[in-house]
Design a protein with these regions (language model features):
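Active-site helix of classical SDR
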Residues: 116, 150
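C-terminal helical subdomain
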Residues: 167-170, 174-175, 189-209
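Substrate-binding pocket helix/loop in short-chain dehydrogenase/reductase
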Residues: 91-93, 97-105
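Conserved glycine-rich Rossmann-like NAD(P)H-binding loop of the short-chain dehydrogenase/reductase
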Residues: 25-41
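Conserved glycine-rich cofactor-binding loop
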Residues: 11-12
Length: 209
């Protein structure tokens, strides 16, 4: 029986590419993101193994409904990839818009916590894996980076969840890319990772024995 991966931020970039790689490897995928049109297009591309689940990751009812629909369709969840996140329009503690800061924190932290909270009951049944998208910005100090601070949270939380999930045979891991060639970064830069590189890392984690 095919395993199932639930992905947030699945409509583009790292999330979409991870979905493609998972389906190639024989997994089913639950695709959760706000963009209904992009999800539909991706699901059409991937076929019967993909289920589009439009919603807002910071909305508990949206996310709970999506998890339930994914389980109903595929029978369970073997891995969850909490990938949704964003940066600031204008970075910096003094220059950034306060509403933009609040929105980023809500997405990068609360959205990730809700994803863990609502998928853990299913992952416990399968002794599954939770993967979080961190960042190189969460592993070193960057002058004034509020975005980086949210990723420091992700790295700390991943370690704590690894300890918790180990008690019942589950696993938690974090992928921490630097600059990746996605719409997240406006400017080109030599040496950028490709989305395929990050997707391959996620697949390595969830398929590890």
């Amino acid at each position: 029986m095919a395993k199932t991966l639930f992905i947030t931020g699945a409509s583009s970039g790292i999330g979409a590419e991870t979905a493609r790689e998972a389906v190639k490897a024989g997994w089913n995928v639950g695709l959760f993101a706000r963009s209904r049109d992009k999800l539909r297009d991706l699901a059409d591309e991937l076929g019967e193994a993909a289920l589009p689940l439009p919603g807002d990751v910071t909305d508990e009812s949206d996310l709970a409904g999506a998890v339930a629909d994914c389980v109903s369709r595929f029978g369970g969840i073997d891995a969850a990839f909490a990938n949704a996140g964003r940066g600031l329009e204008t970075p910096g503690t003094e220059k950034a818009d306060l509403d933009d800061i609040r929105g980023m924190i809500e997405l990068n932290i609360t959205g990730l916590l809700l994803t863990a909270r609502l998928t853990l009951p299913e992952l416990r049944k399968t002794k599954g894996t939770l993967v979080l998208t961190g960042s190189a910005a969460g592993r070193r100090h960057i002058a004034g980076s509020i975005y980086g601070a949210t990723k420091w949270f992700v790295h700390g939380y991943a370690g704590n969840m690894a300890e918790e999930m180990r008690e019942w045979g589950g696993r938690c891991a974090v992928v921490a890319p630097g600059m990746v060639d996605t719409p997240f970064f406006d400017d080109g830069a030599p040496g950028k990772l490709q989305v395929q590189d990050v997707a391959a890392a996620v697949m390595h984690i969830i398929e590890a024995p």
